[in-house]
Amino acid sequence: MWRILSAIALALIVVGCSTLPEELPLGPPGQALAPQPGGPLAAAETALQARLGPEGGPEVSGFHLLDANEAALRWRLALIDSAQHSLDLQYYAWWGDESGVLLMSRVVAAADRGVRVRLIVDDLTTNTLLEIAQERLSDSGLAIVAAHPNIAVRLFNPWRQRSMVGKLFESIEHLDRVNQRMHNKLLIADNRAVILGGRNIGNEYFGLSPEFGFRDLDTLGLGPVARQASAVFDRFWNSEQVVPAGRLGIVATPADLRQAFVGIDAALEAAPRLERFEVAPQDWRDALGDLVQGMHAGSSRVLSDVPGEDDEEEVVHVMPALIRDLLEQAERDVTITNAYIVPDAAAIAWLRDQTGRGVRYRILTNSLASHDVPAVNAHYKAWRDDFLSAGVELYETKPHAAVQPLVVDTPPVVAGFTGLHSKAMVIDGARVFIGSMNLDPRSWRLNSEMGVVVESPGLAAELLANIERDMLPENAWQVVLDEDGDVLWVSGDEVLHRQPARHFWQRVEDVFLMLLPKEIY
């Protein structure tokens, strides 16, 4: 049922077999609305400034770490419900399951009360999910949502071929273009509050999937950081790689929208997985007041790759150099949690230089047992001993980590296993990076990526404590070399001599995927 509702409530499929021209007409330029007086978020920002006092300033924002999956969904609902003027949302993936439909229903409710909504989604995910599910639908969910007079939808790097067969041939003929994806994750409300980090929109990111749950991370920022994020959003909104849904022949009417949402609320109310969430929009003023009192103060920079402009079809990848420069400023220690890591010889040599000048490096990533993308592990595993020889302390997540009930699962759902999805780092106990960027070839050379750097000892201390908790023996294996140079996985008294896996076929898959080039992942 949820795959059907996704077409009603989300941008997840374009029907038909039409072929579009290679050069697509672009939409009119647009920009974020300046922060307006009035509304819960304006009051929250004012309260934050008053609380910070001399500690505040024109460049200082408040930050709240979204560590637990349930809280990550709840605060997205809070910002959407609290918006009075504008919502700008940018996501790589927005699945049509319970969480995706719930969030989109609240976005439509915001538009109903006059909020201007702009949505950018990557066309790779909008066009595949329901086709794989073999759902047959008379109208595109994308068109239905875009039919709202207060909602504008644009697609990043859209398919020119709209049928599955056409997309297959397009992938072969134009692989370089098709392989460029937008991996950004961003929600901005009233240009005052922002959520950014590693989570897409879908049950596995919010503890609502019984198959598996992601250990992920976002931050909620209030203040100038929202305006910084809006500049990134506008850059994509006005780029050559983003096309309005209507220019792709994806059209519907407001009547289609009204008809589509008949029964949505009842279906959400009846969904067992959503028992801890209200379906109707809520008043979050008290929650926002409490939030403000506990936020960490810090100055910030929102970083992003640059979408192609002036007929350029390729993303300009500035993030790798920015991250490298950030790390080279470390004086004492760097602690990293990152889901997907595939280095090369140059990266290992660079790490050896960093540890050689006295900087302690600790890295937490996925094990084969916790991986949701085994192809990444197939190309990462050969580098374990290189990491260790370079002086890196290496940890790998357990699939049944003790921390799962605390931060992964949202009752009543219990995930079958936990996989790491976060992308964050703490530098010298005072500087934090949280974003969408993995440490693999796709993130460095193909996807657009983004993140925020925050100068905040308080936020850094909280994030560091959480990563160190995830490195404890009940949550991860420490990967070490024995006296013969062989790799071991150590967890308390447990010592494993081959990489842990959930089952035999995972090991078979791991061997097979080594044969495929790592660059395609």
Residue ranges and their predicted role:
Residues 17-185, 189-521:
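Charged, low-complexity intrinsically disordered terminal segments
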